[in-house]
Design a protein with these regions (language model features):
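Gly/Ser/Thr-rich loops at beta-strand to alpha-helix junctions
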Residues: 50-62, 118-121, 240-246, 309-310
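A cross-kingdom feature strongest in bacterial/archaeal respiratory oxidoreductases
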Residues: 40, 66, 101, 111-114, ...
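Cofactor-/ligand-binding subdomain signature composed of acidic, glycine-rich
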Residues: 1-48, 107-111, 115, 123-127, ...
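Gly/His-enriched, cation/cofactor- and phosphate-binding structural elements
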Residues: 233-244, 248-290, 295-298, 302, ...
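Anionic-ligand anchoring segments at beta-strand to alpha-helix junctions in alpha/beta enzyme folds, i.e.
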Residues: 52-101, 252-284
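A polyampholytic, Gly/Pro-enriched intrinsically disordered region
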Residues: 91-110, 188-194, 205-215, 282-298, ...
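Non-catalytic, well-ordered alpha-helical segments in soluble enzyme domains
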Residues: 381-401
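Short acidic, glycine/serine/threonine-rich loops at helix termini
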Residues: 12-13, 61-66, 85-91, 124-127, ...
Length: 645
């Protein structure tokens, strides 16, 4: 929010070897009117314009961009790997065997199989939920056998001591959930998938069998299958963490095998970003298709929505893409490598400065609202696109007064998104003619905030896009659950008042919890049968897998100085055996070769890594855009400083 890299005003950058978008264009900051006029001059009817969406932007913004450029010219702004993984996940959630659970459902599971994920670093809230999940079965046993009321937490904790419910983890490296796991299996992604397929076969003989499985894995698969089969609420968790479609399909097979007898099994997928699933459901072409379009001369102008391609694709490929395109327009809130190459940069608000909708990994549509307003040239992403469409005479944009209107058109184009209309009241919603106040009653000190400038309190900002007001004034009762801005009740402080907003203590909010599920699985998808071969490690080439870090791997949070201090520096992780095999004993650094790119990285010893596997931190500054899993070569170096060659 307060980063020095925030983009606060439109900017025009003239290329030295390409014609400008407008003959009167001048380099430097520009007004919103001027920059729209410049863009209008080039985005004429028949121009070859493509749009690249964003998994961290709202459904409204992505759909607006898709409408501007047309469905055939809309590309999902994900890496090729994430595109394949998210397409597979979306299809399984639509047609698969089991529903996706909410966080509360995860807490209530009584047996869990995690396949391929480091949840603490990739989905930390889910990891926290699992720490509560493993207490579920011991608590139920204590309540049933000892007749202890579940609300009597001290007695329940004394009764269960350190007992834990069954949690099985299969991951490419040791995770921080190992202390609560009944068993942990560390292996390459293909071997993780083979274990998953074997568990599915143990649960249902109709599922494809795995040939050549070592005896210890046969025994482990039988153990996992037996526990899941006896559970009342089994849960399978997988996702995009280890970058393997086979792992995702194996998790689907396990869930299908559990559901064959009507068992209420659930299947949860972790996804990379806040709206990754929403973008996948919206649909579009891959980033590789966009690169080919530009290379073949089929692209005049590229409009990028809240996306830094240098984090998703190797730098050389992005450089070629931006060179092949005649003009590049970037809509973003934070400057990066991509905005530095854009001819036109349009500043958009962050999640705290705009309204919109997103779809989480459960498939639940959720609405977010402005926390505060701003008084500069920033706009919501969809507003820039709408204003540009209006200047071009696009009829759809004429009726887009706010997010509600865009969602109405989205639902008309994609009926499966109809629950988006129900996730929050429309912008015109009022209770007794009043808006819902954002500010709590204790915000009365606001009158002194600007007293050094003027003793006259300024008029609160208007918000025509939501039923909320930027003031204390408004309806004082309980609003609909999706519009609750704070919890307070007489005699109850802060979040302690939550029980006054619930149907019952610990239950859902009155009127239902916010959000609506978009997807219910049809169950018509059969078993996947393409089982990968066992991983064969080679001494001259290793499989490089991503290591995620809760502090540092996420694109925007790492820009915060506090988070950046906790983020690790780039490294290459190896086990002790391969350090010796590769001649790295005593070496501080190693050279990693991925294709034509060479990285000099400090060596980090991780004894739990399987043979033939090495790891690098995903998304860490200095390693952005590195596409893994991938095969790579590692060799000793004598240089004393890390870097990229």
């Amino acid at each position: 929010m307060n980063s020095a890299r925030r983009i606060l005003e439109p900017f025009i950058r003239l290329s030295t070897h390409k014609p400008p978008l407008h003959e009167r264009a001048r380099e430097g900051p520009a007004s919103s009117e001027d920059v729209i006029e410049f863009l209008k001059a080039h985005l004429y009817f028949g121009a070859k314009v493509i749009g690249i969406g964003s998994p961290r932007s709202s459904m409204e913004a992505n759909f607006a961009l898709r409408t501007l450029v047309g469905p055939d010219n809309f590309y999902l702004g994900m890496s090729e790997t994430d595109f394949l993984l998210m397409t597979e996940i979306a299809e399984i959630m639509r047609r698969g065997p089991a529903p996706s659970p909410s966080l509360n459902d995860i807490r209530n599971a009584d047996a869990v199989f995690v396949l391929g994920e480091d949840l603490t670093n990739y989905a930390p809230v889910t990891a926290l939920a699992l720490r509560q999940t493993v207490k579920r079965r011991p608590v139920e046993d204590a309540v049933r056998d000892l007749h202890i009321p579940e609300w009597q937490s001290d007695a329940v904790r004394t009764a269960i001591q350190n007992e834990k419910g069954p949690l099985f983890i299969a991951a490419p490296y040791q995770t921080r959930l190992e202390d609560i796991a009944a068993h942990t299996y560390i292996a390459a992604p293909d071997d993780l998938a083979r274990l998953g397929f074997a568990v599915a076969h143990e649960l249902d003989a109709n599922a494809p069998a795995v040939e050549g499985l070592p005896q210890e894995l046969v025994e482990l698969s039988k153990k996992i299958a037996g526990v899941l089969q006896k559970a009342r609420r089994p849960l399978v968790i997988s996702g995009t963490g280890c970058g393997s479609v086979a792992v995702i399909r194996a998790a689907s097979n396990v869930a299908r095998a559990l559901c064959r007898d009507g068992k209420p099994a659930e299947l949860s997928f972790t996804v990379p970003e806040c709206n990754s699933l929403g973008l996948a459901l919206l649909g579009g072409k891959s980033i590789g298709d966009a690169f080919r379009s530009a290379r073949e001369g089929k692209t005049d102008t590229v409009i990028m929505l809240e996306n830094d391609l240098y984090r998703r694709v190797d730098a050389a490929s992005v450089d070629r893409f931006l060179e092949d395109a005649d003009h590049v327009v970037s809509i973003d809130n934070t400057s990066g490598a991509t905005t530095a190459r854009a001819e036109v940069v349009l500043p958009c608000g962050t999640f705290a400065e705009t309204e919109g909708s997103m779809i989480n990994n459960e498939g639940r549509a959720q609405r977010f609202f402005k926390v505060f307003s701003h008084d500069n040239e920033m706009r919501a992403s969809w507003m820039w696109i709408r204003d540009l469409m209006r200047e071009m005479g696009h009829q759809d944009a004429e009726r887009w007064g706010g997010p509600d209107d865009i969602i109405a058109d989205l639902v008309q184009a994609f009926p499966e998104f109809r629950p988006l209309l129900e996730i929050a009241p429309p912008s015109g919603f009022r209770i007794h003619g009043m808006k819902i106040p954002r500010q709590p009653l204790r915000y009365s000190g606001r009158t002194a905030m600007l007293a050094d400038i003027s003793v006259h309190e300024p008029k609160p900002p208007d918000d025509p896009d939501s039923p909320l007001s930027f003031s204390m004034e408004g309806y004082a009762g309980q609003p609909p659950s999706s519009l609750i801005s704070r919890f307070w009740s007489p005699g109850w402080n802060s979040v302690q008042a939550l029980n006054k907003f619930q149907d019952e203590v610990g239950g859902p909010l009155r009127g239902g919890d916010p959000g609506r599920r978009l997807i219910e699985p049809s169950g018509d998808m059969g078993y996947f049968e393409d089982i990968p071969a066992a991983f064969q490690h080679r001494e001259d080439e290793l499989l490089i897998v991503p290591f995620y870090h809760i502090f540092g791997s996420e694109e925007l949070s790492v820009l915060s100085p506090g988070i950046a201090e906790l983020a690790p520096k780039p490294y290459i992780a190896l086990n002790r055996q391969y350090v010796s095999v590769l001649g790295l004993a005593g070496a501080l650094e190693a050279e990693l070769s991925l294709g034509d790119t060479h990285y000099v990285l400090p060596v980090k010893l991780i004894s739990s890594l399987p043979d033939g596997i090495a790891g690098i931190p995903a998304g860490i500054p200095g390693l952005e855009g590195v596409v893994v899993p991938a095969s790579g070569k590692i060799a000793p170096v004598k240089r004393a400083q890390g870097g990229v060659r």
